[in-house]
């Protein structure tokens, strides 16, 4: 059975660790919460989030890759930049998801019932630069950061000056794949 680990980063922000080294973040305002990324889609991330907050949750996807967006099927309100629809569909294929998981050290703990069905990106709300998400007492601003994918987005938590980058900027950001902008 897949379990997630969570660590409080600040009063508003909790970092959630997935089994494939992916990181997700729960940002809580006074009225609602935003989950940034949903990981690989093995095990119920939604159950973990419900233990962390009783507020309504929206999901903001930094991009459509297998390790960032495949758990979105558990959630009602999901935002993604639709420039990533094609890569989301490709990475949502069962074979790609299981291959990605096999790279994880915890692969032996996963059973088929842990598999979360891939969502239809057509049901996601569009996400674009300039979108603002007021969570009550704190706001997430959306910025385009195309490169890693054609729809990569980052989110700034104004009040704490925390920038959530997904894979837009790190030591392993791939910029040479078919879906990257190079």
Where are these regions (language model features)?
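Short, exposed beta-strand/loop patches in secreted or surface proteins that constitute
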Residues: 3-8
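Short, hydrophobic/aromatic-rich segments at coil-to-beta transitions
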Residues: 9-15, 130, 139-141
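Short acidic/glycine-enriched loop/turn segments that link adjacent beta-strands
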Residues: 10, 21, 149-151
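Divalent metal-coordination and catalytic microenvironments
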Residues: 12, 27, 37, 49, ...
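Pre-active-site segment of Zn-dependent metallo-hydrolases
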Residues: 15-60
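Metallo-beta-lactamase
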Residues: 33, 40-41, 132, 139-182
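Active-site HxH/HxHxD metal-binding segment of metal-dependent hydrolases
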Residues: 41-133, 171
């Amino acid at each position: 059975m897949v379990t997630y680990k969570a660590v409080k980063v600040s009063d508003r922000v909790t970092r959630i660790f997935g089994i494939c080294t992916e990181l997700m973040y729960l940002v809580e305002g006074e009225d609602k919460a935003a989950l940034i990324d949903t990981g690989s889609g093995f095990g119920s991330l939604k159950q973990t989030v419900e233990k962390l907050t009783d507020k309504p949750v929206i999901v903001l996807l930094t991009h459509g890759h297998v390790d960032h967006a495949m758990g979105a099927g558990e959630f009602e309100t999901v935002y993604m930049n639709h420039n990533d629809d094609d890569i989301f569909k490709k990475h949502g294929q069962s074979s790609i998801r299981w291959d990605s998981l096999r790279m994880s050290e915890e692969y032996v703990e996963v059973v088929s019932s842990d598999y979360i069905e891939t969502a239809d990106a057509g049901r996601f709300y569009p996400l674009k630069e300039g979108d603002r998400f007021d969570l009550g007492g704190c706001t997430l601003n959306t910025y385009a950061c195309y490169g890693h994918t054609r729809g990569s987005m980052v989110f700034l938590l104004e009040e704490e000056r925390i920038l959530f980058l997904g894979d837009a900027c790190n030591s392993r950001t791939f910029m040479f794949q078919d879906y990257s902008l190079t």
